[in-house]
Curated annotation (Swiss-Prot):
NCBIfam families: F420_cofC. Its EC number is 2.7.7.68. It comes from the Archaea. The keyword Transferase applies. One of its GO terms (molecular function) is GTP binding. Keywords: GTP-binding, Nucleotide-binding, Nucleotidyltransferase, Transferase. One of its GO terms (biological process) is F420-0 metabolic process. It comes from Methanocorpusculum labreanum (strain ATCC 43576 / DSM 4855 / Z). This is 2-phospho-L-lactate guanylyltransferase.
Length: 212
């Protein structure tokens, strides 16, 4: 099935909760690398993507729309313009694969949702995007299920470790370094990050210093 992906992206000073382990310049570079992994997975399904960016950004592999309003407003501006199914996917899901995306877009339901850890929403696939709207932040997963019910849309909930694990905090680096396969994982190792097992627990180090 052909679809078009919407990927919200903040190019300047992203991922502030990683400030304890990455400088602003590093966070901006790391965010770009994670985004590239997401775009690559989308393109390998044979589909295209538009970035919803908060400031000017150039990307050779996706269209770019600059929207300075909030996340919900930007996505809800875009959805009615779609003439094909829409995939809304966050840019900080570097473990996503074409196979995991195929699982989402193959749903028999009107839409599919991948919940994030902690009650958020990491991926939404909706076959008729002009009928849907998003309400991110907080317990958005339950809210999106409620919106679908109000609109009488059937929903499939997709349980996927690769898509439910977003990289927001230092502790999230553990999962990426263990289970990742793309450029974001390689970037971490190239920048001095490593794993160790101490007292039966996996820890993250950078240049020999424990960070998680």
């Amino acid at each position: 099935m052909y679809f078009h992906a919407l990927i919200p992206f903040k190019p300047v000073n992203p991922k502030t909760r990683l400030s304890s382990v990455l400088s602003q310049e590093e966070r901006e570079e790391f965010a770009r690398i994670m985004l590239e992994d997401v775009i690559l997975a989308v393109r390998r399904t044979g589909c295209s993507a538009t970035l919803l960016c908060t400031s000017k950004y150039e990307c050779r592999d996706a269209l770019v729309a600059i929207r300075k309003e909030g996340l919900n407003e930007a996505i809800n501006w875009a959805l009615p313009q779609f003439h094909c199914p829409a995939l809304i996917i966050m840019s900080d899901l570097p473990m996503v694969t074409p196979g995991s995306l195929q699982r989402v877009i193959s749903t028999k339901a009107d839409m599919a949702i991948v919940p994030g850890l902690g009650g958020g929403t990491n991926v939404i696939f909706v076959k008729k995007p002009e009928k849907f709207h998003v309400e991110y932040y907080g317990f958005s997963f339950r809210r999106h299920l409620q919106i679908a019910e109000e609109l009488e849309l059937t929903v499939e909930i997709i349980d996927s470790m690769r898509m439910s694990t977003d990289v927001d905090e230092p502790a999230d680096l553990v999962e990426l370094m263990i289970h990742g396969h793309g450029n974001a994982r390689e970037w971490l190792y190239e920048h001095g990050f490593s794993l160790s097992v101490e007292d039966g627990r996996v820890k993250v180090h950078r240049d020999g210093k424990e960070v998680v």
